[in-house]
Amino acid sequence: MILDYINSRIKILWYTDPFLISREGVIVLETEKTFLIKLEEKNKFIRIFKAHGIFEITFKGKSFIIAGYKLVRKPWKRI
């Protein structure tokens, strides 16, 4: 089973850049090391490194908290 987080909701709980903490949005693109997120406010997009944060992700109706370094790999290699 491939875990694809595109169109999942994400909230940044902790990040190396404090300006990004508490930001929420929808994941529109995922690469091996980054998420591209469409923020709710002002229809802005940001690209963040997965390894630099802790996130709350709502995936298929269930929310979970995960350290980003655990997501650093190609989506199709995750099981």
From Swiss-Prot:
SUPFAM superfamilies: Rof/RNase P subunit-like
Source taxon at top rank: Archaea
Keyword vocabulary terms for this entry: Cytoplasm, Endonuclease, Hydrolase, Nuclease, tRNA processing
Catalytic activity: Endonucleolytic cleavage of RNA, removing 5'-extranucleotides from tRNA precursor
Gene Ontology molecular functions: ribonuclease P activity; RNA binding
GO cellular component terms given for this protein: cytoplasm; ribonuclease P complex
Record keyword Nucleus present: no
Main location: cytoplasm
Quaternary structure annotation from Swiss-Prot or TrEMBL: Consists of a catalytic RNA component and at least 4-5 protein subunits.
Protein name, entry field: Ribonuclease P protein component 1
